[in-house]
Amino acid sequence: MRTGRYSYNAQQRSIVRPIKRVQKLAEGFAQNYDCAVICHEKKEIVSEAMMTVSAKEDIALAFYRACNTVFAQRGCTKLVNVSFLWPEDSEEAFMAELTGYIAALCQKEAVKLGLVTAGVSSFVQKAVISVTAVGYANEDFTDNDGKNQNKTLQAGSTLCMAG
């Protein structure tokens, strides 16, 4: 376990490699095609959630909070961008664990992981995560007049909620 100043090598070991371990996410996405799929939908929805991180559960909370805001607007999350701000004395193993966890969450929820950025500051005491979820409005929830219809959940449907 290494502690100390954040460096390029630490970024490669703790951020890039855990993402590459998840093969589907390591392939990335077709730069022009997938962006076009998101942008050509009728209504784009963007949501952001920021929190301090002390455990993996905090990452899940930020992830689902951003995704649920898109869902609350009758949308479907397609892409997630994540930004970390680490204290200077962060443990590399903790950084790697959290980065791998966000990649696993994206794979579990069938959401593309678009961009992961990280920075270091002497002004933060705990890690800070910012999750930006991008999605589009789901047309299945509107009728011909554009008014919302009340839909009931089917058996076996998954509903995720975060406070």
Set out the residue ranges of the language-model regions.
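Active-site cofactor/substrate anionic-group-binding motifs, chiefly glycine-
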Residues: 39-77
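Hydrophobic/aromatic ligand-binding patch that stacks against planar heteroaromatic rings
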Residues: 69, 105, 151
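Glycine/charge-rich, flexible interdomain linkers and switch-proximal surface loops
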Residues: 119-125
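Phosphate/diphosphate-binding glycine-rich loops and adjacent basic-rich segments that engage nucleotide
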Residues: 131-163
